Regions:
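Short amphipathic C-terminal alpha-helix that caps PH/PH-like domains
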Residues: 188-192
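Acidic low-complexity segments
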Residues: 221-223
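Short, exposed "boundary/linker" segments that immediately precede the start
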Residues: 1-6
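Non-catalytic beta/alpha edge segments that cap or flank active sites
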Residues: 203-207
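Hydrophobic helix-and-loop "lid/oligomerization" segment in the mid-to-C-terminal part
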Residues: 7-186, 197-198, 208, 214-219
Length: 223
């Protein structure tokens, strides 16, 4: 709502942001906001430059807004590149694991950016249909983690049960964040998997499709 309201206030902002998002030849819809405009503003916060988004939202000067919008677009491209590289590395690590034994995927790397791991964790959670914890080990030797879960597994409660291993954590049943020293990551991996096997069954790790209604083939037509 804030973004849409601001778009209505400043002509310079929607034009410049829409230009870099490639949606100037059509009326801006909620889809354009959700998938074109908002991700570019979101990217600056994830990559540690939130002031760019704030300055753009406050700008009423077209040239200034255009410059800021281009910077946001470049940051969004960087975020997408980081996400692809991180997902490739994470999937390579997953290939080395026995998924019959690993009910929770706990992965860590010094190559990852803590502002991007949440998106990658969500993608891996959807692809492998099991709880995922990705940890970016930062220069201060602290791991910043992002967790995503599946239905029936409260990831906040799971982390609460291992809180003695964590420097900090917070979240809710489907998603959480945490801080941890690298030396405790292996133990966290082991403990979370033990906890998951007490809370889940193998069938919980099988993706389910939601069906609105069952119909017979002869009931369908092209009309």
């Amino acid at each position: 709502y804030t973004l849409v309201y601001t778009l209505s206030l400043h002509d310079a902002l929607p034009i410049s942001l829409a230009e870099v998002a490639g949606c100037t030849d059509t009326e801006i819809s909620t889809g354009h906001v959700g998938y074109g405009l908002a991700p570019r503003i979101n990217a600056c916060g994830r990559l540690g430059k939130p002031e760019l988004g704030v300055n753009l939202l406050l700008s009423s000067n077209y040239e200034v807004a255009q410059k800021l919008a281009q910077e946001l677009d470049d940051l969004n491209d960087s975020r997408q590149d980081m996400s692809r590289e991180m997902q490739e590395e994470a999937e390579a690590l997953i290939e080395q694991q026995n998924l019959e034994e690993k009910w929770v995927l706990v992965l860590a790397s010094k190559n990852w950016h803590s502002g991007v791991i949440g998106n990658v964790a969500s993608d891996l959670n959807e692809k492998y249909h099991r709880p995922v914890v990705l940890i970016a080990i930062e220069e201060n030797n602290i791991g910043k983690g992002s967790a995503r879960s599946i239905s029936g597994f409260n990831i906040h409660d799971a982390l609460l049960a291992q809180q003695e291993l964590l420097k900090a954590f917070g979240g809710h049943k489907q998603a959480a964040g945490l801080s941890i020293v690298p030396e405790e990551i292996e133990t966290l991996d082991k403990k979370l998997n033990q906890y998951a096997k007490q809370q889940l069954t193998p069938s919980d790790l099988v993706p389910r499709k939601k069906v609105d209604v069952a119909v017979e083939l002869e009931q369908l037509s092209f009309a």
